[in-house]
Amino acid sequence: MDYKAIFYILNAEDDTENAVCKIIKKHYELKNAVLVSSKDKTLIERINKLLWTFEQLSFIPHSTDKKYDSFTNIILVETGYKNDSILKKDYNVFINLDDEVKTDYHDHEIIVELVKANEDKKKIAREKYLYYKNNKLNVKHENL
């Protein structure tokens, strides 16, 4: 399988929640199954709420680890969530909202990372980039 990591470059004015919703929408339209993970429980809750109102004319079906719906291809979970019957579903896209690199990337075809405008976050993104590149993932950058 050809694994890839996509780094989305965020502008200073881009907020994480809107950026994630745009990325989810893009992959939803491509019929991908998306797993979004963050240690930040409130970030997951904010993204969940925003997905309900993100666009007036469209709805992106999704669920969370708290209210799981097996018919949706998009799930938002807290990092460390351990329900294998849910996590072993074939989520081909993993959106990593944590500072740590996704080392078990073999579970997903596409790893999505966000590159935020501040220097500390850029440094973390560079480290992730090198990790994925050194592990032979096809790495690319996209603007949001």
Stretch-by-stretch model annotation:
Residues K82-D107:
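SF2 helicase motor core recognition
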Residues S37-K39, V77-T79, I95-D98, L114:
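Short His-Asn-centered micro-motif
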